[in-house]
From Swiss-Prot:
Family the UniProt entry places it in: Belongs to the SHMT family.
Taxonomic placement: Bacteria, Bacillati, Bacillota, Clostridia, Eubacteriales
Coiled-coil boundaries: none
Record carries keyword Amino-acid biosynthesis: yes
GO cellular component: cytosol
Protein name per the record: Serine hydroxymethyltransferase
Species assigned in the record: Clostridium perfringens (strain ATCC 13124 / DSM 756 / JCM 1290 / NCIMB 6125 / NCTC 8237 / Type A)
Purpose: Catalyzes the reversible interconversion of serine and glycine with tetrahydrofolate (THF) serving as the one-carbon carrier. This reaction serves as the major source of one-carbon groups required for the biosynthesis of purines, thymidylate, methionine, and other important biomolecules. Also exhibits THF-independent aldolase activity toward beta-hydroxyamino acids, producing glycine and aldehydes, via a retro-aldol mechanism.
Length: 410
């Protein structure tokens, strides 16, 4: 992209943008929630649409001059409904957290009981963490993973639901590497008369391409971000049954947001169009293949994988047997050009600022073109770095740079 105007107007920011570009180009990005957008998505984000205020919804705006952005939003809504087979879509949420908040406000009252996945077992802040608005406003009861299998025990979820009678059951996760059984969760919700919301922020790309079962036939509400496996701009979206559309829309605007970001909604529309192409399914298939190969390679070096593997795009690694914390592993690997994040593991004994594990994802490196052989090399580099953490890391930096040079960012 051309940054001539930025360089003229603000050298400091232009310099930092260039530095970040170089960091991305010369690093192996393994953060499971990150990806690289297409140039088309980036151009939409930087378009004239950023100038337009458009409170309200298409044909029901509080400002004039919205006829063009109405078409943009309509395109985004229709494309995402087609992508997921949904009855209604709202593409205005600025983030996944705000998408979840809008759903809660649509059907809950403060103090209502909700069943959600424990953050330390792979859930998300907005699924009831006490430090988040969700845990502060509502009475969340947490379910986790089974101590032995490290996967969701649906019978335990059923028992909790029967005991606590939640008004809403929240499914989905930010660090769970296995298939989620939405049909069974729907059955549990029906047993206790609860709504079902599924947060597919991490697996949206897999759901869209049929590589993970879709929650849309079972859930009352489905929320997501657009910037992880969907490979779009940073933002959120909500899908729901038509009967909830009116309540949902008014809880986005005027409920928790004012004007939508029309340049981001345009970029969302572009990413939905890209996701409808056959090439996107090919991409997502490679994401999953890469995750499987990387997981197997890490296991061959003695790394303990939570639930012993992965069905999706991410791997949760328990480093307890490697004599290193998640925090120290993150810092160590960052120093050689591999970016990932420390992460709690089931039955965590350390602080969330230290952790016993790391989370690894393959969407971003797959976008660059990395395939199975590169996964084996990445696993080897990670193993060598942790094994030689107090030694000379320069040869490992060179191996990272060699991989990055083979697959340019853009």
């Amino acid at each position: 992209m051309n940054f001539d105007n930025l360089e003229r107007e603000d050298e400091q920011i232009a310099h930092l943008v260039q530095k970040e570009k170089e960091r991305q180009e010369n690093s192996i990005e393994l953060i499971a929630s990150e990806n690289f957008v297409s140039k088309a998505v980036m151009e939409a984000m930087g378009s004239y649409l950023t100038n337009k205020y458009a409170e309200g919804y298409p044909s029901k705006r509080y400002y004039g001059g919205c006829h063009v952005v109405d078409e943009v939003e309509d395109l985004a809504r229709e494309r995402v409904k087609k992508l997921f087979g949904a009855e209604h879509a709202n593409v205005q949420p600025h983030s996944g957290s705000q998408a979840n908040m809008a759903v809660y406000f649509s059907i809950l009252e403060p103090g209502d009981t909700v069943l959600g996945m424990d953050l330390s077992h792979g859930g998300h802040l907005t699924h009831g963490s006490p430090v988040n608005f969700s845990g502060r406003l509502f009475n969340f009861v947490s379910y986790g993973v089974d101590k032995e299998t490290e996967t969701i025990n649906y019978e335990t979820v059923r028992e909790l639901a029967l005991k606590h009678k939640p008004k809403l059951i929240v499914a989905g996760a930010s660090a769970y590497s296995r298939i989620i059984d939405f049909k069974t969760l729907r059955e549990i919700a029906d047993e206790v008369g609860a709504y079902l919301m599924v947060d597919i922020a991490h697996i949206a790309g897999l759901v869209a391409t049929g590589l993970h079962p879709s929650p849309v036939p079972y859930a009352d509400f489905v929320t997501s971000t657009t910037h992880k496996t969907l490979r779009g701009p940073r933002g959120g979206l909500i899908l729901c049954k038509e009967k909830f559309a009116k309540a949902l829309d008014k809880n986005i605007f005027p409920g928790i947001q004012g004007g939508p970001l029309m340049h981001i909604i345009a970029a969302k529309a572009v990413c939905f169009k890209e996701a409808l192409e056959p090439s996107f399914k090919t991409y997502m298939e490679q994401v999953v293949k890469n995750a499987h190969v990387l997981a197997e390679a890490l296991e061959s070096y003695g790394f303990k994988l939570v639930s012993n593997g992965t069905d999706n795009h991410l791997i949760l690694v328990d480093l307890t047997n490697k004599d290193i914390t998640g925090k120290d592993a993150e810092i160590l690997l960052d120093s050689i050009g591999i970016t990932l994040n420390k992460n709690t593991v089931p039955n965590e004994t350390r602080s969330p600022f230290v952790t016993s594990g790391v989370r690894i994802g393959t969407p971003a490196i797959t976008t660059r073109g990395f395939k199975e052989e590169e996964m084996k090399e990445i696993a080897s580099i990670i193993n060598d770095a942790i094994k030689e953490k107090d030694g000379d890391l320069e040869p490992l930096k060179a191996r990272v740079k060699a991989l990055c040079a083979k697959y340019p960012l853009y």
